[in-house]
Design a protein with these regions (language model features):
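Membrane-helix interface "capping/anchor" motifs
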Residues: 46-58, 101-112
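Cytosolic-side transmembrane-helix boundaries in multi-pass membrane proteins
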Residues: 125-165
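Structural signature of hydrophobic alpha-helical transmembrane segments
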Residues: 25-36, 78-90
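Conserved mixed alpha/beta catalytic, RNA-binding, or beta-rich assembly cores of soluble enzyme
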Residues: 47-76
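Short, small-residue-biased leader/transition segments that mark boundaries at the very start
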Residues: 1-6
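Individual transmembrane alpha-helix segments
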Residues: 9-38, 42
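Loop-to-transmembrane alpha-helix initiation sites
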Residues: 81-90, 111-113, 129-142
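Hydrophobic alpha-helical segments embedded in the membrane of multi-pass proteins
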Residues: 36-40, 58-66, 84-98, 112-120
Length: 165
Protein backbone atom coordinates (compact mmCIF):
# COMPACT_ATOMS: atom_id res chain seq x y z
CA UNK A 1 0.00 0.00 0.00
CA UNK A 2 2.85 2.38 0.86
CA UNK A 3 4.52 1.76 -2.49
CA UNK A 4 1.36 2.69 -4.42
CA UNK A 5 0.79 5.89 -2.44
CA UNK A 6 4.41 6.96 -2.80
CA UNK A 7 4.62 6.35 -6.55
CA UNK A 8 1.15 7.70 -7.31
CA UNK A 9 2.05 11.07 -5.79
CA UNK A 10 5.16 11.21 -7.99
CA UNK A 11 3.46 10.42 -11.31
CA UNK A 12 3.26 13.27 -13.82
CA UNK A 13 -0.05 13.94 -15.55
CA UNK A 14 -1.14 11.72 -18.46
CA UNK A 15 -0.39 14.32 -21.17
CA UNK A 16 3.20 14.65 -19.97
CA UNK A 17 3.55 10.87 -19.98
CA UNK A 18 2.15 10.70 -23.52
CA UNK A 19 4.97 12.88 -24.82
CA UNK A 20 7.76 11.38 -22.74
CA UNK A 21 8.04 13.58 -19.66
CA UNK A 22 8.36 10.93 -16.97
CA UNK A 23 9.81 13.11 -14.25
CA UNK A 24 11.69 16.38 -13.99
CA UNK A 25 13.24 15.86 -17.42
CA UNK A 26 12.11 14.57 -20.78
CA UNK A 27 13.09 11.03 -21.60
CA UNK A 28 13.79 9.74 -18.11
CA UNK A 29 13.05 6.08 -18.63
CA UNK A 30 14.17 3.00 -20.46
CA UNK A 31 13.97 2.69 -24.22
CA UNK A 32 10.42 2.05 -25.32
CA UNK A 33 8.68 3.59 -22.36
CA UNK A 34 9.80 7.14 -22.97
CA UNK A 35 7.35 8.52 -25.52
CA UNK A 36 3.99 6.79 -25.87
CA UNK A 37 3.09 9.13 -28.73
CA UNK A 38 5.96 7.77 -30.85
CA UNK A 39 4.83 4.23 -30.09
CA UNK A 40 1.29 5.13 -31.17
CA UNK A 41 2.72 6.51 -34.43
CA UNK A 42 4.47 3.16 -34.91
CA UNK A 43 1.17 1.38 -34.29
CA UNK A 44 -0.60 3.56 -36.85
CA UNK A 45 2.11 2.89 -39.43
CA UNK A 46 2.02 -0.88 -38.91
CA UNK A 47 -1.78 -0.90 -39.11
CA UNK A 48 -1.67 1.20 -42.28
CA UNK A 49 0.86 -1.16 -43.89
CA UNK A 50 -1.18 -4.17 -42.65
CA UNK A 51 1.81 -5.62 -40.83
CA UNK A 52 -0.39 -6.30 -37.78
CA UNK A 53 -4.11 -6.25 -37.00
CA UNK A 54 -5.72 -4.12 -34.33
CA UNK A 55 -6.99 -7.03 -32.23
CA UNK A 56 -4.06 -7.65 -29.88
CA UNK A 57 -2.89 -4.08 -29.11
CA UNK A 58 -6.40 -2.67 -28.70
CA UNK A 59 -7.59 -5.54 -26.51
CA UNK A 60 -4.54 -5.26 -24.25
CA UNK A 61 -4.75 -1.48 -23.85
CA UNK A 62 -8.55 -1.51 -23.41
CA UNK A 63 -8.39 -4.28 -20.79
CA UNK A 64 -5.69 -2.51 -18.81
CA UNK A 65 -7.67 0.75 -19.03
CA UNK A 66 -10.92 -0.85 -17.84
CA UNK A 67 -9.47 -2.87 -14.97
CA UNK A 68 -7.13 -0.15 -13.73
CA UNK A 69 -10.03 2.32 -14.04
CA UNK A 70 -12.27 0.08 -11.93
CA UNK A 71 -9.51 -0.22 -9.34
CA UNK A 72 -9.01 3.56 -9.34
CA UNK A 73 -12.75 4.13 -8.88
CA UNK A 74 -12.90 1.60 -6.05
CA UNK A 75 -9.86 3.05 -4.30
CA UNK A 76 -8.22 6.30 -5.52
CA UNK A 77 -4.88 5.12 -4.11
CA UNK A 78 -4.44 3.20 -7.36
CA UNK A 79 -3.11 5.25 -10.27
CA UNK A 80 -5.25 6.95 -12.92
CA UNK A 81 -5.85 4.54 -15.85
CA UNK A 82 -4.35 6.97 -18.38
CA UNK A 83 -1.19 7.19 -16.32
CA UNK A 84 -1.11 3.39 -16.13
CA UNK A 85 -1.34 3.11 -19.92
CA UNK A 86 1.17 5.83 -20.79
CA UNK A 87 3.80 4.90 -18.19
CA UNK A 88 6.00 1.86 -18.24
CA UNK A 89 6.41 -0.60 -21.07
CA UNK A 90 2.71 -1.30 -21.63
CA UNK A 91 2.56 0.41 -25.03
CA UNK A 92 5.81 -1.16 -26.20
CA UNK A 93 4.65 -4.61 -25.16
CA UNK A 94 1.15 -4.25 -26.59
CA UNK A 95 2.29 -2.87 -29.94
CA UNK A 96 5.61 -4.56 -30.70
CA UNK A 97 6.04 -7.59 -28.43
CA UNK A 98 2.61 -9.21 -28.13
CA UNK A 99 1.91 -8.98 -31.86
CA UNK A 100 4.74 -11.34 -32.80
CA UNK A 101 3.46 -13.72 -35.48
CA UNK A 102 5.11 -16.83 -34.09
CA UNK A 103 3.80 -16.57 -30.54
CA UNK A 104 0.35 -15.00 -31.02
CA UNK A 105 -2.88 -16.83 -31.93
CA UNK A 106 -3.95 -17.33 -35.54
CA UNK A 107 -7.60 -16.22 -35.46
CA UNK A 108 -9.08 -12.82 -34.63
CA UNK A 109 -11.16 -14.30 -31.81
CA UNK A 110 -8.03 -15.98 -30.43
CA UNK A 111 -6.14 -12.68 -30.66
CA UNK A 112 -8.84 -10.94 -28.64
CA UNK A 113 -8.76 -13.66 -25.95
CA UNK A 114 -4.95 -13.46 -25.91
CA UNK A 115 -4.97 -9.67 -25.58
CA UNK A 116 -7.59 -9.57 -22.83
CA UNK A 117 -5.69 -12.18 -20.82
CA UNK A 118 -2.41 -10.26 -21.23
CA UNK A 119 -4.10 -7.05 -20.10
CA UNK A 120 -5.65 -8.72 -17.07
CA UNK A 121 -2.40 -10.43 -16.06
CA UNK A 122 -0.52 -7.15 -16.49
CA UNK A 123 -2.83 -5.34 -14.08
CA UNK A 124 -2.64 -8.20 -11.57
CA UNK A 125 1.17 -8.44 -11.69
CA UNK A 126 1.65 -4.66 -11.55
CA UNK A 127 -0.61 -4.17 -8.54
CA UNK A 128 -0.20 -7.32 -6.47
CA UNK A 129 3.07 -8.77 -7.70
CA UNK A 130 6.54 -7.83 -6.61
CA UNK A 131 7.44 -6.35 -10.01
CA UNK A 132 6.36 -2.85 -11.09
CA UNK A 133 6.29 -3.91 -14.74
CA UNK A 134 4.16 -6.98 -15.40
CA UNK A 135 3.82 -6.65 -19.17
CA UNK A 136 6.72 -8.90 -20.14
CA UNK A 137 5.67 -11.60 -17.68
CA UNK A 138 2.07 -11.46 -18.92
CA UNK A 139 3.21 -11.86 -22.53
CA UNK A 140 5.44 -14.81 -21.65
CA UNK A 141 2.66 -16.52 -19.69
CA UNK A 142 0.15 -16.08 -22.50
CA UNK A 143 2.70 -17.24 -25.09
CA UNK A 144 2.63 -20.57 -23.27
CA UNK A 145 -1.17 -20.65 -23.62
CA UNK A 146 -1.23 -19.75 -27.34
CA UNK A 147 -1.32 -23.40 -28.52
CA UNK A 148 -4.29 -24.00 -26.21
CA UNK A 149 -6.08 -20.94 -27.59
CA UNK A 150 -5.35 -22.10 -31.15
CA UNK A 151 -6.76 -25.54 -30.31
CA UNK A 152 -10.11 -24.22 -29.08
CA UNK A 153 -10.46 -21.30 -31.50
CA UNK A 154 -9.63 -22.97 -34.78
CA UNK A 155 -9.63 -21.08 -38.06
CA UNK A 156 -11.93 -22.25 -40.82
CA UNK A 157 -10.23 -24.36 -43.42
CA UNK A 158 -10.01 -23.00 -46.93
CA UNK A 159 -13.31 -23.70 -48.70
CA UNK A 160 -15.08 -24.84 -45.54
CA UNK A 161 -18.72 -23.84 -45.28
CA UNK A 162 -20.65 -23.38 -42.04
CA UNK A 163 -22.53 -26.48 -40.87
CA UNK A 164 -26.25 -26.52 -41.69
CA UNK A 165 -28.61 -26.89 -38.78
Amino acid sequence: EFRRVLFRSQLPDALSLLFGATGDTFGAGTTGEVCAFALLLGLAYMLWKKVITWHIPVSIIATVFVFSGLMHLANPVYANPLAVIFSGGLMLGAIFMATDYVTSPMTHKGMLIYGVCIGLLTVIIRNWGSYPEGMSFAILIMNAFTPLINTYVKPKRFGEKPAKK
